[in-house]
Amino acid sequence: MSALNSLPLPVVRLLAFFHEELSERRPGRVPQTVQLWVGCLLVILISMTFEIPFVALSLAVLFYGIQSNAFYTKFVAILFVVATVLEIGSLFLIYKWSYGEPLIRLIIAGPILMGCMFLMRTHRLGLVFFAVAIVAIYGQTFPAMLDYPEVVVRLTLWCIVVGLYPTLLMTLIGVLWFPSRAISQMHQALNDRLDDAISHLTDSLAPLPETRIEREALALQKLNVFCLADDANWRTQNAWWQSCVATVTYIYSTLNRYDPTSFADSQAIIEFRQKLASEINKLQHAVAEGQCWQSDWRISESEAMAARECNLENICQTLLQLGQMDPNTPPTPAAKPPSMAADAFTNPDYMRYAVKTLLACLICYTFYSGVDWEGIHTCMLTCVIVANPNVGSSYQKMVLRFGGAFCGAILALLFTLLVMPWLDNIVELLFVLAPIFLLGAWIATSSERSSYIGTQMVVTFALATLENVFGPVYDLVEIRDRALGIIIGTVVSAVIYTFVWPESEARTLPQKLAGTLGMLSKVMRIPRQQEVTALRTYLQIRIGLHAAFNACEEMCQRVALERQLDSEERALLIERSQTVIRQGRDLLHAWDATWNSAQALDNALQPDRAGQFADALEKYAAGLATALSRSPQITLEETPASQAILPTLLKQEQHVCQLFARLPDWTAPALTPATEQAQGATQ
């Protein structure tokens, strides 16, 4: 019996979650981890040498600033410079008019905090306003702790140094000296996806989880944005490279479910698979060299027949369309997104969000001022950091912050008791800190769902052991106060966000599902013919479906944390939503299979068949918001012409009918198990 079998199921699931998160494969993760690790050690060396205070803040700047590629790091560095100017300006404004008057100081700081939190949710550059909000709140602790205005001004001026020198450091490391370019990461990512595709094409492998496929598809889209902004050649041949990304995503996601043992291994099929794998290898070599791939392969009738027999014709045609595309094809002009959210000034949730954050901060400020316990001022920072648009995401951030703070506090306690008494110089300190910072950097560069644990762990550790001390420290009170401050801020935020204007996603989730199914119906209306425009449209919408399904999955996870909802209603909503997501993914792959057979069918028959499916799906999606959707019932008419031309298509479309019938009935009090059907529609 393995050790895992003796552990409770929740513990096993937690360990599996962390294993999945920490072992994430992502181009650029190792360079980002090394840059962050080296940057942390340099910050400690510089701060200790020149006795620069607020070392934890400098480390936080690094963890938020060093990104996965050089362009993104440079962009964030510019934002940090702008944010630093705004932060210090707002602090001096507050101090000038209200240094000795706590009430007036809060009256001035309150609107600044509310404005920053409002803009953080509605503006594209929300990170800047988040940083301003953090400093505006953190700066309120200076006058309360010190009675000397001159010292407070000096500390505030030190904040400029504390914020800007790590920004300069990360620019030197991540942009000038050891840049990790987005274009190189894109080439590596495309080759990795094609390697996985070839493995599934030639061997019978277990399919990867759909969530992983969708996240890697989204990662390619993000890299495409960075490449477009950072590489001139990519901009020149943008249309070809975008088509390449879409094609690779399609091949990778489709072959993930492909099982070569499901088809007869005739000589023609074996030779065709070898030829297809050879063409994919040629595409890999061209991508690795940064060249646009061109193919002279023309499919013969025997190869087309073999491709149709093993359900690879659509993949083959999609690949060849890319190989025959002109690299200098002009790109489609992209619409520039607005800087503000469309409903920024009409949706009251944004202002309520800002008011809730301010209320939580004021409660924490009143508490720690009333009990005269300045060491727990981290509770105010916690209220701003864990403020998220909805209850579920706020709870997620609270768990991450508490978990990171707990790990950081334990490390700080062990470090203070067992290691600090044996240290004599800065070199020994750096050697001891190196593994701690490396662990924090590796966690911080993992998945977005858990990366904040690494940041919080290192910042909490630094606050307790390195903050404003330039020699050995043995004060355990700091560790206690920082941890308690985070716990208090988390509890206050949980109460406020749960009972004061709670923003639940329980109503948004069915609407999100409806939008996703609407995209799927658009896919079904695209003519199933190997025409260039139709294929490109199909691939682009398909990528959008990956993003939509992933967003629905994440929203389900957040709704599961909304404990203010009735437990039975929440469980039923999540069960139905997950069933819709699962069936939607299966419908997408089943519809892919029909493309391989539909080309031989008369064009006049296809719009009627596809329209029948699309209409049923749109009708089902329209009733999700009001919980009036019933499982679609579709019956296909088997015409002699279609049976004579290609009976395989009818079987594939009957499978689509079965998937339609398994969609949950939202009018029923509980989910009923789906039944297997031979011909599709009728239950």
Swiss-Prot record:
Induction: Induced by LeuO, part of the mdtNO operon.
Keywords for this protein: Antibiotic resistance, Cell inner membrane, Cell membrane, Membrane, Transmembrane, Transmembrane helix, Transport
Regions crossing the membrane: 43-63, 75-95, 100-120, 125-145, 158-178, 402-422, 426-446, 457-477, 483-503
Keyword Nucleotide-binding attributed: no
Keyword Cell inner membrane annotated: yes
Entry GO CC: membrane; plasma membrane; transporter complex
One MF annotation (Gene Ontology) recorded for this entry: sulfathiazole transmembrane transporter activity
InterPro entries linked to this entry: PHBA_efflux_AaeB/fusaric-R (IPR006726)
Primary location: membrane
Record's bilayer topology term: Multi-pass membrane protein
Biological processes annotated in GO: response to antibiotic; sulfathiazole transmembrane transport; transmembrane transport
Subcellular location: Cell inner membrane
Domain of life (superkingdom): Bacteria
Xref: PANTHER family: MULTIDRUG RESISTANCE PROTEIN MDTO, P-HYDROXYBENZOIC ACID EFFLUX PUMP SUBUNIT-RELATED
Quaternary structure, from the entry: Could be part of a tripartite efflux system composed of MdtN, MdtO and MdtP.
NCBIfam families (UniProt xref): PRK11427.1 (NF008510)
Role of this protein: Could be involved in resistance to puromycin, acriflavine and tetraphenylarsonium chloride.
Family: Belongs to the MdtO family.
Protein name in UniProt: Multidrug resistance protein MdtO
Originating species: Escherichia coli (strain K12)
Organismal lineage: Bacteria, Pseudomonadati, Pseudomonadota, Gammaproteobacteria, Enterobacterales
